Regions:
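A SIS-like phosphosugar-recognition module
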Residues: 1-154
């Protein structure tokens, strides 16, 4: 079913980076959306067992994001919250970040996703430090560089 990441403001960058880490390091499907963007249509795909990470900003609309987390859990989703203050009450898994001002949270809120992507790759028996289909340097715009990979395996 893959993973969904939701965030607002500067944490949207961490959410997008987490999606890339999930795809490149853990070699699993993932989607990153703004929290408000998710609420305008994609929410229709919510099903039992869906895995969602929500980055929280203690100073910007956190109460809305906590309500969303609660609603997702009521629909059977597994919700991970990453942020500061007050998320324990939702019953979701909560990774509390050290206290920093909202403007600087983006510096640290990617760290849990980095650790989790590496761990998921190991649990799945995948090497998070190598690419299966892509060379480290993309040299042309066409295809998937499979010829480069065939040369490596020969």
């Amino acid at each position: 079913m893959g993973y969904r990441g939701l965030a607002r403001g500067a944490s949207a960058s961490s959410c997008n980076e987490a999606r890339l880490l999930w795809e490149e390091a853990a070699k699993s499907t993932a989607t990153a959306l703004t929290t408000s963007g998710f609420r305008h249509g994609p929410q229709e795909m919510v099903r039992e067992g869906l895995r969602v990470a929500i980055w929280l900003d203690k100073d910007h609309l956190q109460h809305h994001d906590l309500k969303l987390a609660s609603d997702l859990r009521a629909l059977g989703a597994k919700v991970l919250l990453i942020g500061q203050q007050g998320a324990e009450s939702t019953g979701s898994l909560f990774l509390e970040l050290p206290a920093v001002t909202s403007e600087w949270q983006f510096v640290i809120d990617i760290i849990p996703a980095q650790v989790a992507a590496e761990r998921l790759a190991r649990l799945a028996g995948r090497d998070c430090d190598s690419f299966r289909l892509c060379s480290y340097i993309v040299t042309d715009e066409g295809g998937l560089s499979l010829n480069d990979l065939e040369g490596k395996s020969a």
